Amino acid sequence: MEEFVRQCFNPMIVELAEKTMKEYGEDPKIETNKFAAICTHLEVCFMYSDFHFIDERGESKIVESGDPNALLKHRFEIIEGRDRTMAWTVVNSICNTTGVEKPKFLPDLYDYKENRFIEIGVTRREVHIYYLEKANKIKSEKTHIHIFSFTGEEMATKADYTLDEESRARIKTRLFTIRQEMASRGLWDSFVSPREAKRQLKKDLKSQEPCAGLPNKVSHRTSPALKTLEPMWMDSNRTAALRASFLKCPKK
C-alpha cells in the first residue's frame, strides 16, 4: 500500500500526509491504510478548492486555464495540510476578519463566498452514517459538512453542495479511479476492512518485495497548480493559496 500511495499521489500531497502523521506520532510505513486515507482526503480538499475564485463583488468564478485576473481572489482558504499551530492561526485570523464563530475543531476549508467553514469527509462506508458521525462530533450548525464516498455518493448539510456539478464530478471520478486502482492490485479489501488490513500488514512485514505491477516512474505533469502555503496575514493582496497538480494513478 505504501508504494501504491507514493506512485498514485502528487509528491507534495505525500509529503504533507507524512508530516501530518508524524505530528501525531504515527508511522506511514506501518499505518499504510491511514497514510492512503490522509492522502486521499488532502487531494479532495485541494480539488475542492482548485479553480474557484470570487470577484470584487463576491461572485463565484471558475478559472481553469492561465493566471486568473489580479482582481480575483481564491474562494477557499485551505486549512487542511497545515501544522496545527499554523492552522489555528489561520482560523483565528479568518474569525477576527469576518466575525464568524470560531469552530471547536479544526475545519478543512473556509469559503469566502458563503462565509463558512467546511468539513470535508471521504468515506469507505455509507455516506449518511459518516455524515452523522461528523455532525455529532462537530456539534455546530455553523460548520458546513460535505461527505464524498468512493462509490460516487455524496451528502452535504441541507443538501447544499457548494460546488457546481462538474467540479464535484471531477472529485467523484478521482475517488472512483483510486478505488479501481486499489482493487486491481488487491489493496481495496484491506483498505475497507480493519481485520483484513491487519492480516495484510503481517503479510507485508514478512515480505520485502516491492508491490507488483507498479511502475518505477511517475509522470510529473503539472496543471495550474501548487503555488505556496503562505500565512494569509503576510500578504493581504495574495492570490495564491495551496494548489496541487493531481497525478492520476498510473495504469497497469
From Swiss-Prot:
Record localization: Host cytoplasm; Host nucleus
Give the transmembrane ranges: none
| Keywords annotated in UniProt | Decay of host mRNAs by virus, Eukaryotic host gene expression shutoff by virus, Host cytoplasm, Host gene expression shutoff by virus, Host mRNA suppression by virus, Host nucleus, Host-virus interaction
Pfam families referenced in this protein's UniProt entry, alphabetically: Flu_PA
Q: Which GO terms describe its biological process?
A: viral RNA genome replication; viral translational frameshifting
Site note Important for efficient shutoff activity and nuclear localization applies to 195, 198-199
Residue positions of the active site: 80, 108
Q: Which Gene3D superfamilies match?
A: Influenza RNA-dependent RNA polymerase subunit PA, endonuclease domain
Presence of the UniProt keyword Metal-binding in the record: no
The GO terms this record gives for MF are: RNA binding
Q: Where is this site: Important for efficient shutoff activity?
A: 202-203, 206
InterPro entries according to UniProt: PA/PA-X, PA/PA-X_sf
Q: What does this protein do?
A: Plays a major role in the shutoff of the host protein expression by cleaving mRNAs probably via an endonuclease activity. This host shutoff allows the virus to escape from the host antiviral response. Hijacks host RNA splicing machinery to selectively target host RNAs containing introns for destruction. This may explain the preferential degradation of RNAs that have undergone co- or post-transcriptional processing.
Q: What is known of its domains?
A: The probable endonuclease active site in the N-terminus and the basic amino acid cluster in the C-terminus are important for the shutoff activity. The C-terminus acts as a nuclear localization signal. The C-terminus is recruited to host protein complexes involved in nuclear Pol II RNA processing.
Please give the family membership noted in the entry. Answer: Belongs to the influenza viruses PA-X family.
Q: What is the protein named?
A: Protein PA-X
